[in-house]
């Protein structure tokens, strides 16, 4: 450590280098993006296809299956699911984490092209795809409402003007419009009028399509100029379509208005959006990857006044919900914890050193290390989020350790009579290796985590690198700036001290002397101390195995998602009234700020709600308590069920479900799946460890099954294609023509008027035109009867799948729920044709369960290797690592005491403890080895003196680390659920470890020294 003198003798250069580090950190801080959690870019692509009027089973067999066969051949697909409903199919592809999303998108487009020839010819457009991130919840929801404009007009303004402007804002990734559909001209046919006039549905469709064409007409050139030809070949409004002549009947023109009601309406009338129970069109905004959430929301808010100017004054554009408030509050809480941690750490130093000048040294080292870390975070592309700020909060107790060790040793020499400059040179060299060992071994803890693949590695990479960088900067500061400041600020001890300081020093001396006496007795009965060590190891293993576990702590983000489901035969109008009723009840809750909901689309028996809660400081109750209260209010509502779950900042898996966790049932036999799914669902619903159990299997929809008499059809001159075309024209909401406008394109939609299709008698009014042009009643060759039919068909891979979703009641961990599910499935005795497995977050939790122990063992092994290299010894690292069992025991006992399940956040706390508690042993072992080698001191006396000599810095560093994490334990504001497990783990582990390792480490050192000195067997040469 001779290089220390280079900095000690050049204080100006050292201070300027430190200033440069601080300035670069401040600059990086200003440019860092802000987010709730590290960016998790799940490579997911959704392929969408539509065939209006097609049944879910038809969509599954003719659209989903060809696409799945082509898409399933793409390399790197980890999960492929599809959902087919009335007229639409979505195939969701989740790729491996290391798969480039842009390359995957090119492969997806190629697969779609390859499957195109196998898809039905009547599809209005080619299948399309989009990149999505399932973990990205909406950052803002805007609403448009009006007393004078229709929902279709509001939707048109939103899609043609607002969506374009919003998409251009920096940071906006996706803008989705919901709550209605685009304007359209609707042709609602009167079957009886068609029959009376001798007009077929196909004739109406052909007439409309031929009357609205958009083709170039060319130009005429005369000698002087060119004349472009323009015709009135396009029709734009219902009024222009009504007088169209379809045919002449008995010498009179049969116009469209004679056989149909033609109105300016919307493409899909079964679509509704609401804001606080008032009709509204919804604008849902998501951010782009790597975007700063706060800055993006601020830019959107700044643009809102300009957006309002682009729409009529009678339209109210409001921001219904945005996520910035809870993110700001959560980050503010972490920043407060960070400030309190730094203050407590400095207070600990002052209490022990009893000198303002000495306290100033670590008081400078801590913020310099933390601020300098911001520069590295910016260069690494990180963000200011809960995890990175938690890393800095915890680091405030770590980075001071190096400065404390150096400062305490230099102060000891100053108190012994050396001049500050000499003390800085000598003291810095003495502990230089110790400081390097402490810091390098602490950073080594995170090497396995950084090498970890999958979600754990991606999620905690920012935390690990941020903490490692702050420790590395602290190491540099402690070996450069700290000795310089010690040489300039410390003063030789005054002969007289103030009574207050003398009293504290005397108290510390008494404690140290008491520790010395106790250590003597422990060393005299070393076997008992070793037994305590072994017992703590056994108890740690037992606690880890029996501890309730979960994936991530349940967060209170101030946002809830509600899913409403009614009977599968529920009509759109009935469902709309139910959704409005649920929204009124939810909005009346004192904790709810606003409610935005929608229903409709192709599934008329379901709806959804986005619920924004009031600030936590205002509502008092956490999200789970609000959910429990609303659940009890709405439990007895007839005809529909509402499922609620708290929105989480991280969501794994692209599969949509009503609950936060999923269990999937797969089978190659759809009949077996439909037979066993209700049994398993009932079994899950009876488990006290689960709530809100639901299934996405909807196979009880009302269907009218038509049976054709093909012999009679042949005799009448009718083809099956003609009949299916008739049914599609009548009931398929068929888009038969396109209206082109400057800003958008709109559709002409044809179908039987709802007044004539309210019951099954509508089929009796259907007539098919045969090959001779004669109208033939549908009932003359077809019969029909009601039956059950699926509202949607789900696939995973190429197998039928049904997903059971569930939530957890308060106080139940995911491991307890998973164990209950496994027991229930075993008890049911499912056949081999039905396979069950967890999906989404629950599946990742199962995978991480097996990797957690290996991650801890890998961290211990890495630290052992690093320490072995530093000490050039196989034995001494074992002495240092002997501190770990007591720390693990304390951490797990603390989690049990606070009724907190073991999560990934607690796992990070365990890894941190591996790095923290060994510092105490390092300080003891270093000085004991030095005393043995340089002074020839006996091993027992060496470790005894080392323990006494390093007692003060050990207590100081442990208290600093403990108090640095204490604000995390005591936090109660926004985001506290994420911070508390980390603080509880660290504080609990440090308390127990401090009480035990001060005694067990010297004992282990003695036994290891005996092991090292044990005579080895050597071959005896043969005597001649």
UniProtKB/Swiss-Prot annotation:
Part of a tripartite efflux system composed of MdtA, MdtB and MdtC. MdtC forms a heteromultimer with MdtB. This is Multidrug resistance protein MdtC. Pfam families: ACR_tran. HAMAP family: MdtC (MF_01424). InterPro entries: AcrB_DN_DC_subdom, Acrflvin-R, Multidrug-R_MdtC. Keywords: Cell inner membrane, Cell membrane, Membrane, Transmembrane, Transmembrane helix, Transport. The keyword Transit peptide does not apply. The lineage of its organism: Bacteria, Pseudomonadati, Pseudomonadota, Gammaproteobacteria, Enterobacterales. GO terms for cellular component: plasma membrane. GO terms for molecular function: xenobiotic transmembrane transporter activity. The keyword Transmembrane applies. Belongs to the resistance-nodulation-cell division (RND) (TC 2.A.6) family. MdtC subfamily. It is a multi-pass membrane protein. It is found in: Cell inner membrane. The chain crosses the membrane at residues 3-23, 333-353, 360-380, 387-407, 431-451, 463-483, 528-548, 853-873, 875-895, 897-917, 953-973, 984-1004. It comes from the Bacteria. Signal peptide: none annotated.
């Amino acid at each position: 450590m001779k290089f220390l003198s280079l900095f000690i003798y050049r204080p100006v250069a050292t201070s300027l280098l430190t200033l440069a580090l601080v300035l670069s950190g401040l600059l990086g801080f200003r440019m860092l993006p802000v987010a709730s959690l590290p960016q998790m870019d799940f490579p997911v692509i959704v392929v969408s296809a539509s065939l209006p009027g097609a049944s879910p089973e038809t969509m599954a067999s003719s659209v989903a299956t060809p696409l799945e066969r082509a898409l399933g051949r793409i390399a790197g697909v980890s999960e492929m699911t599809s959902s087919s409903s009335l007229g639409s199919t979505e195939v969701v592809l989740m790729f491996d984490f290391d798969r480039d999303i842009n390359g995957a998108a090119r492969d997806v487009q190629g697969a779609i092209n390859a499957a195109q020839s196998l898809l039905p010819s009547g599809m209005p457009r080619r299948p399309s795809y989009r990149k999505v991130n399932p973990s990205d919840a909406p950052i803002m929801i805007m609403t448009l409402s009006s007393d004078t404009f229709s929902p279709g007009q509001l939707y048109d303004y939103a899609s043609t003007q607002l969506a374009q402007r919003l998409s251009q804002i920096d940071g906006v990734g996706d803008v989705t419009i919901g709550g209605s559909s685009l304007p359209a001209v609707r042709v609602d046919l009167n079957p009886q009028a068609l029959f009376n006039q001798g007009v077929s549905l196909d004739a109406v469709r052909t007439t409309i399509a031929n009357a609205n064409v958009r083709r170039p007409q060319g130009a005429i050139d005369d000698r002087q100029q060119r004349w472009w030809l323009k015709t009135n070949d396009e029709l734009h409004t219902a009024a222009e379509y009504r007088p169209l002549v379809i045919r002449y009947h008995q010498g009179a023109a049969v116009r469209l208005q004679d056989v149909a009601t033609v109105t300016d309406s919307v493409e899909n009338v079964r679509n509704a959006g609401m804001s606080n129970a008032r009709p509204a069109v919804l604008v849902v905004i998501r951010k782009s990857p790597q975007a700063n959430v706060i800055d993006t929301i601020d830019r959107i808010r700044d643009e809102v006044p300009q957006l309002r100017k682009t729409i009529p004054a009678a339209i109210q554009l409001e921001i219904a919900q945005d996520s910035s408030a809870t993110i700001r509050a959560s980050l503010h809480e972490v920043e407060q914890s960070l400030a309190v941690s730094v203050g407590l750490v400095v207070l600990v130093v002052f209490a022990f050193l009893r000198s303002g000048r000495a306290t100033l040294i670590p008081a400078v080292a801590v913020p310099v290390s933390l601020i300098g870390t911001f520069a590295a975070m910016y260069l690494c592309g990180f963000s200011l989020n809960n995890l990175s700020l938690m890393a800095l909060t915890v680091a405030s107790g770590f980075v001071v350790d190096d400065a404390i060790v150096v400062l305490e040793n230099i102060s000891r020499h100053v108190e012994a009579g050396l001049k500050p400059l000499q003390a800085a040179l000598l003291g810095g060299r003495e502990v230089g290796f110790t400081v390097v060992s402490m810091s390098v071994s602490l950073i080594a803890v995170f090497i396995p985590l950084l090498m970890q693949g999958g979600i754990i590695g991606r999620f905690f990479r920012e935390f690990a690198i941020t903490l490692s960088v702050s420790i590395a900067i602290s190491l540099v500061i402690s070996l450069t700036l700290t000795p310089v400041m010690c040489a300039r600020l410390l003063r030789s001890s005054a002969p007289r001290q103030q009574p207050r300081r003398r009293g504290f020093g005397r108290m510390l001396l008494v404690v140290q002397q008491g520790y010395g006496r106790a250590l003597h007795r422990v060393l005299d009965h070393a076997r008992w101390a070793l037994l305590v060590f072994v017992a703590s190891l056994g108890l740690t293993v037992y606690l880890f195995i029996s501890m309730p576990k979960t994936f991530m702590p349940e967060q209170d983000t101030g946002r809830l998602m509600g899913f409403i489901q009614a009977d599968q035969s529920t009509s759109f109008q009935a469902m709309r009234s139910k959704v409005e009723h649920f929204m009124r009840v939810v909005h009346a809750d004192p904790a709810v700020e606003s409610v935005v909901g929608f229903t409709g689309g192709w599934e008329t028996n379901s709806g959804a709600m986005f619920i924004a809660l009031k600030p936590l400081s205002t509502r008092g109750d956490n999200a789970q308590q609000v959910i429990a209260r609303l659940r009890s209010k709405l439990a007895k509502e007839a005809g529909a069920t509402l499922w609620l779950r708290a929105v989480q900042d991280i969501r794994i898996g692209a599969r949509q479900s009503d609950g936060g966790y999923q269990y999937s049932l797969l089978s190659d036999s759809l009949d077996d799946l439909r037979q066993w799914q209700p049994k398993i669902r009932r079994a899950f619903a009876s488990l006290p460890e689960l709530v809100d159990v639901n299934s996405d299997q909807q196979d009880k929809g009302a269907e009218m099954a038509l049976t054709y008499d093909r012999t009679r059809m042949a005799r009448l001159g009718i083809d099956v294609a003609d009949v299916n075309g008739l049914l599609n024209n009548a009931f398929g909401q068929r888009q038969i023509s396109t209206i082109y406008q400057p800003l958008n394109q709109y559709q002409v939609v044809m179908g039987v008027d709802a007044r004539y299709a309210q019951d099954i008698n509508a089929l009796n009014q259907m007539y098919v035109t045969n090959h001779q042009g004669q109208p033939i009643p549908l009932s003359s060759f077809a019969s029909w009867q009601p039956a059950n039919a699926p509202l949607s068909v789900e696939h995973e891979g190429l197998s039928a799948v049904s997903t059971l979703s569930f939530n957890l009641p308060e106080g139940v961990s995911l491991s307890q729920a998973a164990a209950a599910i496994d027991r229930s499935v075993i008890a049911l005795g499912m056949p081999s044709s039905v396979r069950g497995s967890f999906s989404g977050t629950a599946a990742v939790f199962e995978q991480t369960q097996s990797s957690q122990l290996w991650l801890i063992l890998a961290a211990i092994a890495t630290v052992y290797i690093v320490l072995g290299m530093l000490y050039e010894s196989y034995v001494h690292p074992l002495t240092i690592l002997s501190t770990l069992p007591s720390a693990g025991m304390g951490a797990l006992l603390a989690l049990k005491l606070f009724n907190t399940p073991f999560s990934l956040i607690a796992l990070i706390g365990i890894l941190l403890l591996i790095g923290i508690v060994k510092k105490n042993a390092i300080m003891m072992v270093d000085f004991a080895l030095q005393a043995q080698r340089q002074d020839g001191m006996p091993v027992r006396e060496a470790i005894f003196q080392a323990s006494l000599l390093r007692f003060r810095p050990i207590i100081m560093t442990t208290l600093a680390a403990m108090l640095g994490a204490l604000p995390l334990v005591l936090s109660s504001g926004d985001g506290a659920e994420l911070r508390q497990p980390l603080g509880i783990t660290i504080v609990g582990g440090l308390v127990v470890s401090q009480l035990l390792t001060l005694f067990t480490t010297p004992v282990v050192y003695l036994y290891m020294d005996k092991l090292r000195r044990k005579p080895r067997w050597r071959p005896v040469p043969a005597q001649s």
